[in-house]
């Protein structure tokens, strides 16, 4: 399974770059909210996780310069057809993150933040390590995966069709159409 390694599925297909936003947040119990960076570490303090983990290396002109945004590079950081985010490093939350902590003086930070269990255990086992399971990929995605769905039966009552995306109920006429 590719999940929890360096490829993550966004559960959308035919992703479009327009309006695409992606961040990696860390749930920081010390401050009580999700943070796009770590609050400590010589090389990690206040540096966006998206940069530390290799997903922000280019600016909007594809020049090698950080800009705080996800590098939407088809085939390198994203597979738009399958809806996969691709970290350009093998163990983003393991050895890659660990490489930023000073060997002698920051072993406590390495022990606190590095989620090596992702690469040593099954996904189910790793998710149960609550002290480390605090990283989240969040953002906005537009998908061109529209398709037709044939509803069974005849004479479907108008406004009787309910469509949801996750737990969000979509609005007929705005988010989808029904040909009664």
Residue ranges and their predicted role:
Residues 1-180:
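Surface-exposed, low-hydrophobicity segments enriched in Gly/Pro/acidic/Ser residues
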């Amino acid at each position: 399974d590719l999940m929890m390694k360096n490829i993550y599925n966004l559960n959308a297909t035919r992703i479009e770059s327009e309006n695409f936003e992606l961040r990696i947040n860390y749930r920081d119990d010390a401050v009580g909210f999700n943070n796009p960076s770590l609050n400590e570490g010589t090389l990690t303090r206040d540096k966006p996780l998206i940069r530390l983990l290799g997903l922000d290396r280019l600016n909007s002109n594809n020049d090698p310069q950080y800009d705080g945004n996800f590098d939407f590079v088809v085939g390198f950081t994203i597979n738009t057809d399958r809806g996969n985010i691709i970290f350009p490093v093998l163990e983003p939350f393991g050895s890659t993150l660990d490489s930023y902590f000073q060997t002698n003086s920051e072993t406590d930070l390495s022990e606190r933040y590095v989620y090596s269990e992702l690469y040593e255990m099954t996904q189910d086992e790793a998710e149960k390590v609550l002290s480390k399971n605090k990283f989240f990929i969040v953002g906005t995605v537009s998908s061109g995966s529209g398709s037709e769905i044939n509803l069974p039966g005849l004479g479907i009552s108008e406004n009787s069709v309910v469509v949801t995306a996750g737990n969000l109920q979509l609005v007929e006429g705005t988010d989808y159409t029904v040909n009664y």
